[in-house]
Amino acid sequence: IPKRSGAKVKSIITYNFDDLIEESLSKVKLEYKTIYRDEEQHDSDELPIYHVHGFIPGRESFDREASLVFSEEAYHKVYSEPYHWSNLVQLATLRENNCLMIGLSLSDPNLRRLLEIAAQKQSKNCRHYAFIQRLSNDSLIDDSSCVKINEASVNKILQTHHIIQEKMMESLGTRVIWFEDYSEIPVLLDEIRK
């Protein structure tokens, strides 16, 4: 990740509560600002890291006032408030930038809703990309099962599933980048960066 002036990465939005991203950025001495509530602001030389479901930092800087979206009820409250800061940040980012989504199943209804809204209003230059792990017949066929499934049938079903997934994501302005093993992600990121 380049330094902030001329940075290609404008922000990071995470749905995780932990501070693992911050720990990694500290190791490479990149300035960042953790944002997990409405009143937080960042300087132009800081990479904003938005924790849209809340934040639990390491013990040394634990904030007892931080709100977390743990329960389904709390999630629905955020989801139903269109002007909640986390929805506004996500929507603005999705509308104005090319986004790369890693580690998401993209089954979250609020994220899909925001992607759909952004796809309707975004410029034609904005595209989003999502790394999604390709399902394999190995993950679906259990050799110890007494029920035998035809491998060719499973492959056909998976192929159809992947095509449907791609079309569905395309309607949300997002192109799927398939991977089979997590070790492929750094290589794919290097290819994208070039």
Please give the residue ranges for each predicted region.
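Active-site glycine-centered loops adjacent to acidic/histidine catalytic or metal-binding residues
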Residues: 16
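SIR2/sirtuin-family catalytic core signature
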Residues: 1-10, 27-48, 59, 87-194
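Active-site micro-motifs of SAM-dependent methyltransferase domains
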Residues: 19
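Active-site glycine-rich loop that binds ribose-phosphate moieties when present
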Residues: 34, 69-88
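Conserved subregion of the PPM/PP2C metallophosphatase catalytic domain
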Residues: 22-26
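Active-site-proximal helix-loop elements at catalytic-domain edges
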Residues: 53-76
